[in-house]
Amino acid sequence: MKMTGLASEQAAPITQGWYIALSFAVALILSLILTSRDKAFWNVYQGKKETIPLTIVWGILGFFLVFFGQMIGAAIETAVFGIEGGSQNTADIVAIAKGAPIAILAIVVFGPILEEFVFRRVIFGSLVQTTNFWVAAIVSAIFFAIIHFDFSHILLYTICGLIFAFLYHKTKRIWTSIIAHVMLNGFVTLVQFYAEPLQKFLQELEKMQ
């Protein structure tokens, strides 16, 4: 028995959503298992790390830093390069999440944690020990931007990568950048999910005035 065209189109996002969620979950679990065997893996910085409460505070502040950093980056993209706002990459991912809400876990939780492991701990953390903050931050941020395959907005991703690196460097705790990254992805997902209903609501308010 074959699916109809409509049924096939509806099934595709669901399949993709579950695949993304499960693959990210497995990758995260494997990463945690492998890194737990090396006690020195997280000891990138010498000296005292930031306290847990201040780590959380810096993580929340970091979200706002990234948010405003993206606003500045978007303004530069528009003014200098004529690039319009909005990301097709983000829109595609959110479309999958709407078809399979399980994918939200990958977008908001699993993905950010994995990306912080790879780009901040592995790439930035390795380079900062042999070079300096700026070299490590710029290189890791560029790789972070490239891996998203949204080259029209590479400046925005690079800015995010630089700020995440700063947060990790400032507090000496990877959880700081993870908190900021999770909050950013969660905020973007929430806005994308409710952008259309919110727009309709505002239009109705205008009609009532």
Language-model segments: what does each one mean?
Residues 137, 141, 145, 152-209:
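Functionally important transmembrane alpha-helices
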Residues 113-118, 122-123, 150, 183, ...:
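Active-site His/Glu-centered metal-binding helix of metallohydrolases
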Residues 32-42, 167-171:
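Structural signal for the C-terminal ends of transmembrane alpha-helices
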Residues 1-38:
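Alpha-helical transmembrane segments in multi-pass membrane proteins
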Residues 114-139, 166-173:
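Membrane-interface helix/loop boundary segments of multi-pass membrane proteins
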Residues 56-72, 76, 109, 113, ...:
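Hydrophobic, lipid-facing residues on alpha-helical transmembrane segments of integral membrane proteins
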Residues 8-14, 41-111, 129, 197-209:
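Juxtamembrane helix-loop-helix connectors linking adjacent transmembrane helices
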Residues 17, 21, 55-60, 101-105, ...:
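Hydrophobic alpha-helical transmembrane segments
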